[in-house]
């Protein structure tokens, strides 16, 4: 199964969600940076979801926006 990134923005909460899969109850949460929350697979420890709090403020003040994670992006084929 392909793991595609989806991006959602909650204007009211000012949160950017980056998802590999839907959020589920068994995931572990960890703050990996200044108000950046990672939701981890409980078995593998891999990041499955990110929540970037106060996104519009960050985007306006910090460019480029950097996340404290390694990324291996590939085209879905």
What is each PLM-predicted segment?
Residues 32-35:
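Short, small/polar residue-rich loop motifs at catalytic or cofactor-binding pockets
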Residues 23-26, 54-56:
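Short, surface-exposed beta-strand-loop junctions and turns on beta-sheet-rich folds
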Residues 10-11, 41-42:
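Short, acidic, Ser/Thr-enriched surface-loop or helix-capping motifs
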Residues 7, 38-39:
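A residue-level detector for well-ordered beta-strand positions
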Residues 15-20:
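Short, aliphatic-rich beta-strand segments
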Residues 54-77:
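C-terminal structural segments of small proteins and small subunits
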């Amino acid at each position: 199964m392909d793991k595609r990134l989806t991006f959602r923005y909650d204007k009211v909460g000012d949160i950017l969600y980056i998802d590999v899969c839907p959020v589920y109850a068994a995931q572990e949460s960890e703050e990996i940076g200044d108000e950046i929350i990672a939701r981890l697979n409980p078995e593998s420890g891999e990041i499955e979801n990110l929540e970037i709090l106060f996104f519009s403020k960050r985007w306006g003040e910090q460019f480029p926006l950097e996340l404290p994670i390694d990324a291996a992006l590939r085209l879905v084929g």
